[in-house]
Amino acid sequence: MAGHDSGNARRGRASFGAFVRKPVERDSVANAGQAAEPGSPEATQAWPDDAVEVGAVVDAYGLKGWVKVATHADAGRGGDALLNARRWWLERGAERLSVRIMQSKTHSDTVVAQPAGVSDRDAALSMRGFRVFVRREDFPALAADEFYWVDLIGLEVVNEQSVALGKVSGMIDNGVHSIMRVEYPATGKDGQPTTDERLIPFVGVYVKTVDQAARRIVVDWEADY
């Protein structure tokens, strides 16, 4: 999914603000046939600190216990995190489960998967409504100068004159490139403190450096734009 390439100002496309990487050409089947450790979906209180929501179970797929997941990023792009992870964490209300994934693949604009211990359609249907999380460490590695959205949230944004412009609060995909939502403190019409937002295209002509270690993004952007 999208990264920052100041050389040619390109950006990949994504469909949500949790993570993003460049478009990837890939076979429609990922990890098919790779066996996971045996076990059924199990209740868990041990929730990983780096869990990132990447989709939701919306239906069963077929008759043999596969589930269909609507991803927060295009399958075959950001959806690669779902395909790459061998364990998913599921949440529906107060219910939390951990499940190993035996097989997964893309299907149209969704990801379909076979959780261990889910053997028929009825069991798969019972999983509808679960939000799906994977660990950040299970995301596929990116090429140089590319970034997942989740890693940009909270970074400070300054311009080339070191003027603070705010912090990244989210990302938007407009179908052509990504856009940073940058929140900053402001004063409301009633004189009370509030927050305002500026939108900065995440393209090379504006984004000059992204320093994740320093948690800072430098942009060619003025405070009064």
Curated annotation (Swiss-Prot):
Domain of life where this protein originates: Bacteria
GO biological processes: ribosomal small subunit biogenesis; rRNA processing
Subcellular location: Cytoplasm
GO molecular function terms listed in the Swiss-Prot or TrEMBL record: ribosome binding
UniProt cross-references to HAMAP family, sorted A to Z: Ribosome_mat_RimM
Domain notes: The PRC barrel domain binds ribosomal protein uS19.
Protein name in UniProt: Ribosome maturation factor RimM
Protein's organism: Burkholderia orbicola (strain MC0-3)
